[in-house]
Amino acid sequence: MRQSKKLGQCFLKDKNFVKKAINRAEITNNDIVLEVGLGEGALTKELAKIAKKVYVIELDERLKPFADEITAEFENVEIIWSDALKVDLKNLGFNKIVANLPYQISSPITFKFLEEDFETAVLMYQYEFAKRMAGKPDTKEYSRLSVAVQYNADVEFICKVPPSAFSPKPDVNSAIVKLTKREPKYHVKDEEFFKKVLKAVFQHRNRTIKRALIDSSHEIEVDRDNLKGILEKIENEFDFTQRVFKTPPEKIGDLSNLLYDEIANLE
């Protein structure tokens, strides 16, 4: 079958990486596993041999012959023919996720997962995306993505995966990443506002926090002059001279809370 470029299909063929993903997810016969992207079923079959239940969300119904073969062999596999971004995941009851994700939905599907109550996710991403997810302050990989994902999950970069592990071979390297869900390590008063602050400051990651906020005041929906006034008012409560890429996540959380309170006072 010719894979769909539109759907970003690159099927994982190398069984060594299939086994590595399953091993790092520590799958047991009590686990209910979610997979996104059936492919030719290489990962699905190995999951089904161990897990109690495997849900697979797949959009491309041309893969039905592979699905039929797998469901005939494994009674614990259920295929959901739909767009993973549109499926209500709440009722599936999975506790682990293992998937070779279509790269063009990497960001939205990851944040959709993070809204759910799961233990562990072992996921395949484009290499550069994976490095940014795991990025730490004062590195070139540290980004809005790093802070947003690490807010309520620990991120472990497991290994680089070469194009030769897939069919067809993608033009880029890939990587396996493990996400372990947890409670946030710091408190933000409003998560949606926190996301706006992240977007605002990381548009200018090499600038100071103060300069980045002023230049992206529209992202937090505050008039530029009003924002300047707020920053002057709270200048002794936060180090606005620090560069964005050097500012730890919890400090950005503190910044978000300060701004949230001050903006509320404007209304």
From Swiss-Prot:
S-adenosyl-L-methionine binds at L12, G37, E58, D83, N100. One of its GO terms (molecular function) is RNA binding. One of its GO terms (cellular component) is cytoplasm. Its EC number is 2.1.1.-. Pfam families: RrnaAD. InterPro entries: KsgA/Erm, rRNA_Ade_diMease-like_C, rRNA_Ade_Mease_Trfase_CS, rRNA_Ade_methylase_Trfase_N, rRNA_adenine_dimethylase, SAM-dependent_MTases_sf. Belongs to the class I-like SAM-binding methyltransferase superfamily. rRNA adenine N(6)-methyltransferase family. RsmA subfamily. This is Probable ribosomal RNA small subunit methyltransferase A. The lineage of its organism: Archaea, Methanobacteriati, Methanobacteriota, Methanomada group, Methanococci. Keywords: Cytoplasm, Methyltransferase, RNA-binding, rRNA processing, S-adenosyl-L-methionine, Transferase. It comes from the Archaea. Its main location: cytoplasm. Specifically dimethylates two adjacent adenosines in the loop of a conserved hairpin near the 3'-end of 16S rRNA in the 30S particle. May play a critical role in biogenesis of 30S subunits. It comes from Methanococcus maripaludis (strain DSM 14266 / JCM 13030 / NBRC 101832 / S2 / LL). The gene is rsmA. It is found in: Cytoplasm.
